[in-house]
Every structure is written in structure tokens, then in C-alpha cells.
């Protein structure tokens, strides 16, 4: 009889333990306001929150990561056709939905590749889990994410400028090939891949990058504004740009990056109302000094750049991760924080433009 009681108690204990573990992820409270609650007069707070441990575990509603192949060109002296590929995050429910999806074009840093954010197809990172949870909890809009590479043939290249020239040149590949081919294959806000429709859907497109991917992001602000409203550079500045440009203006001269951006925005036919820059870096990141220099320079050009501190009112801000360095941990933190904020901005703008929510 005693043995039966002991066995019963052990089984009961195991069942209780399993139930507690199963519910642990469900009990994680939301960190951000659900995007569906955003109204035309909602304030959008700016700040960095820590990633709850539960968000790093697999979500119930899991998106997937697949490979997307496309044809492009070197767009240099070689003038060579290339077959390249990107990894694509497809949110849970995409296949059964008829909705259109925002797109985040995402770029790795120096020596990185398309796996730098999501991982390998058979060994995905917990960044993917974080995105799944944010979408499941309605803290960010379901978005397609395109993890691309600026390297020719998707192969790391030896360069004498830490890839700066490649980050600048990627604009032609993006505009002419990757963007139209991807948005032809997937259901985005572009009604077609005509130039007119791609431009008309710019409010639902984001460019995001880490390190030299952040440099890529700043360059896209200078040449691709017709396709993108939102720019999210993680830990990188134009002071890391191509060597000829930096030599011309000076690596430690803080007074040229904002004017360069200002001139490029105007040359593309846009104004201060046409974009938002959500920059993030860490206080212990080696990129911090030059990122902060660029942000300070932009603050001096208030006709074009209107700085936000606590909430979204202007068109750019810098959020700092306390003690964050230049690493994967910081990347995950910035993904976790930036995508909900951008989602809220997109929803609020859609409401204001539609005239709904009166």
C-alpha cells in the first residue's frame, strides 16, 4: 500500500511540474502595447526594455524561415550576372491569410551573411523565437523579413574598407532586383512591382541593419527613400562609410554626416515628413562614439531632423542599451524593441491617413 501511495505522489508531482513548465511561457506578460490598440491620438513611447526569458523559447504560433533565390548583377566593372539568395522570415498564418504584409529588409555586418539574424535553416536562433512571440502577443505587426547580403554571390569578400563600398553599392541590387523580385513572389502592400506601386507602398517598408548593415541602412536613406519610410540602424554610422567619402570629410570631423543626409534627402525629392530613423546602440559598444557623433550632428540640422527623446513626435531618435556591446545579445535586444515601436508608428500613420478612428 505504501508503495502505491509513493508512486501516486510521484506521478502527481511530475504532472504538476509539467503543467507549471507548460504555462511558464504563457504567463510572460506583454512588454509593449498591442499594435491593435493604437489610435490616432496614441502616444508612442521610446525606450529599451529587456527581453523576457520566455520570449527566447519557442512560441506556440511559430513562423518559418525559408530561402529565396533571385537574379542580380554585380553593378561594378565586372558587370556580371549573379544568382543570389536571401533568407525570409514568414510569420505564422501568412499562408492562410489574404492580408498584405509589411516588409523589413535586414542586413548583416562585416563578415556576416544571411544567417546572422535568423540562423541556419536547420538551426534557427532565438531571435526568431523573439519575433514569433512579439507577433503572437500582438506587440508587433506580422511582418515579412528579408535577410539579405551585400556580398557578391553570398560569399564573404576581402575588402580594404571593411565592406563600406559594398554597403553603398547594394542600393542598385536592392532597387533593381531583390525588392521587385521578392515583392512579386510575396503578398506585400505593393499592388504590383511597377515603379509606381512600389513607391506608393513605401509606408509599409523598413530597412534595418547591424554594424556595417547599419551603414547600409544610412546609405539606403540616401538613395532609396522612394521605397522606404522607416530606417533602423543598429550600431553603425556614416563615419564608417566608403573610404573616399570619409577621407574627403574626415573620420573625426563631426560636422558632415547630417549635411550629407540632408542633401541626399532633398535630392530625392523628400522632406522631413517623409521618414523616421530609429537608431540603437550600446553604451559599451565600440560604435557608440561615432553613432553619437552622427546623431548630435543631425540635431544641429533641425530643419530636416527633429529629435525625439521620450516619445514619437519628430522623425529620428537614438536609443541606448545600457552596457550593451557589439554582439548578438545586443542585436536580439534591439530587434525586440524596435519592431514593436515601428509597428505602432505604421498603424498610427495608417489611421491618420485613412481618417478612421475619429
Where are these predicted regions, by residue range?
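Positively charged n-region of N-terminal signal peptides that target proteins for export
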Residues: 1-4
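Short, conserved catalytic or interaction motifs in soluble domains
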Residues: 20
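C-terminal motif of bacterial Sec signal peptides marking the signal peptidase cleavage site
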Residues: 14-17
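Non-catalytic cap/lid and distal C-terminal segments of serine-dependent acyl enzymes
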Residues: 23-358
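Short, linear, compositionally biased motifs with a strong N-terminal bias
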Residues: 10-11
Amino acid at each position: 500500500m505504501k508503495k502505491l501511495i509513493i508512486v501516486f505522489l510521484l506521478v502527481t508531482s511530475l504532472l504538476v511540474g509539467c503543467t507549471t513548465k507548460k504555462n511558464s511561457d504563457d504567463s510572460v506578460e506583454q512588454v509593449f502595447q498591442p499594435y491593435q490598440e493604437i489610435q490616432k491620438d496614441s502616444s508612442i513611447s521610446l525606450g529599451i526594455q529587456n527581453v523576457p526569458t520566455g520570449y527566447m523559447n519557442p512560441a506556440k504560433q511559430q513562423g518559418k524561415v525559408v530561402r529565396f533565390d533571385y537574379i542580380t548583377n554585380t553593378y561594378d566593372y565586372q558587370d556580371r550576372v549573379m544568382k543570389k539568395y536571401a533568407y525570409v522570415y514568414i510569420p505564422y498564418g501568412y499562408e492562410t491569410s489574404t492580408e498584405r504584409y509589411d516588409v523589413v529588409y535586414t542586413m548583416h555586418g562585416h563578415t556576416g551573411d544571411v544567417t546572422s539574424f535568423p540562423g541556419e535553416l536547420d538551426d534557427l536562433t532565438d531571435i526568431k523565437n523573439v519575433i514569433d512571440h512579439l507577433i503572437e502577443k500582438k506587440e508587433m505587426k506580422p511582418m515579412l523579413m528579408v535577410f539579405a547580403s551585400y556580398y557578391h554571390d553570398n560569399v564573404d569578400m576581402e575588402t580594404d574598407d571593411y565592406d563600406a563600398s559594398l554597403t553603398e553599392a547594394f542600393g542598385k541590387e536592392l532597387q533593381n532586383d531583390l525588392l521587385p523580385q521578392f515583392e512579386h513572389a510575396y503578398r506585400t502592400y505593393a499592388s504590383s512591382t511597377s515603379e509606381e506601386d512600389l513607391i506608393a507602398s513605401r509606408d509599409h517598408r523598413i530597412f534595418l541593419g547591424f554594424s556595417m548593415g547599419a551603414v547600409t541602412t544610412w546609405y539606403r536613406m540616401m538613395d532609396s527613400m522612394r521605397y522606404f519610410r522607416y530606417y533602423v540602424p543598429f550600431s553603425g554610422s556614416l563615419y564608417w562609410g566608403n573610404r573616399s567619402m570619409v577621407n574627403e570629410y574626415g573620420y573625426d570631423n563631426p560636422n558632415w554626416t547630417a549635411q550629407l543626409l540632408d542633401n541626399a534627402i532633398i535630392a530625392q525629392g523628400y522632406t522631413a515628413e517623409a521618414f523616421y530613423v530609429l537608431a540603437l546602440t550600446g553604451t559599451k559598444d565600440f560604435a557608440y562614439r561615432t553613432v553619437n557623433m552622427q546623431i548630435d550632428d543631425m540635431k544641429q540640422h533641425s530643419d530636416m531632423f527633429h529629435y525625439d527623446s521620450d516619445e514619437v513626435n519628430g522623425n529620428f531618435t537614438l536609443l541606448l542599451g545600457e552596457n550593451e556591446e557589439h554582439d548578438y545579445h545586443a542585436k536580439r535586444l534591439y530587434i525586440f524593441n524596435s519592431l514593436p515601436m515601428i509597428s505602432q508608428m505604421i498603424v498610427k500613420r495608417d489611421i491618420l491617413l485613412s481618417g478612421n478612428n475619429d
